[in-house]
Amino acid sequence: AIEVGLIERFTPSASHSSLMLATMDERQSPGPISRWLSTAQPEALFVLSAVAQYIGAALAVLLFDQVEPQTVAWFRVMGAGTVLLVISRGWWREWTREQLVGVALFGITTALMNIFFYLAIDRIDLGKGVTIEFIGPILVAACTTRSVRNGVALAFAIVGVVVLGGVEVDNNLAGLVFILIASALWALYIVFGARVAHVDRGVAGLGLGLVIGTIATAPIGAPWSGPVWVSPLLLGLCLLVGVFSNAVGYGIDQFTLRRIPIRRFSLLLALLPVTASLVGWIALDQRPSTIDVIGIALVLIGVAMQERDEIERVERVVQTDPA
């Protein structure tokens, strides 16, 4: 009941979403990239987002020998927030207090999620970490599933994730605790992110949120940042992680959340453990077993089965003076 109430409180209704989308159509003249992101199949967007996020994560793992994981995550958030604000025109104008609170909650949640995720994958495999972290999105999907078909699809995804994740994390209790915290924060990321996505700011809400998150989590990431500031190579690589994982990955999420309900979004996130396993195999030589492949297949079946509903777009109605 608590989860459902939280989701309903912070998730825009279908009518509100449609109204916001209509307002966005009226105010904005999107470029070709925005038009493509607004019309491409959500499954394709998720794969693209996942590839970007886990290329960044694989690069981050390689940096952990030289920089503390929480510091890499902090620079990731900082770099992405800075880039997104630079490319967002007029991001500082016309924010309401309610919108700013929502953006701040989203940004702080995202920053903490990144930090705990990196602390976890410093201790456990990338693919298994993402799979266990998927518990959060599964809870969101379960709380928002209303049809039998979607329930069956969710069941396939859950079983696939359990199979893919396995039952062991190399007896690393700290890694398990960190990834479970990241999982809870991922659930909040979906709920708060859906709210921010429907604010008429392109990716400015994401950028501003990440800057706020950077400031809020400075006590966690900044104390170990000395080696990064004095090494242009390390600084550039840390910021590159942010561009791949947050600016590109989360930016695509914002476009997707404007188009589909969070129930479908949460289940489509099952593609991320699959992609993480493949990226871990290619980039980090973390090879999936036969059982892992079975888990991947079950996830893909669940994703294919679910209803492909989208948030209805409303055409702008212009009322003329009869006189």
Locations of the language-model features?
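Hydrophobic alpha-helical transmembrane segments of multi-pass membrane transport proteins
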Residues: 48-55, 59, 87, 104-119, ...
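Hydrophobic alpha-helical transmembrane segments of multi-pass integral membrane proteins
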Residues: 41-45, 71-86, 150-156, 174-181, ...
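Alpha-helical transmembrane segments of compact multi-pass small-molecule transporters, enriched
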Residues: 78-83, 132-143, 212-216, 264, ...
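Hydrophobic/aromatic residues within transmembrane alpha-helices
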Residues: 63, 72, 76, 120, ...
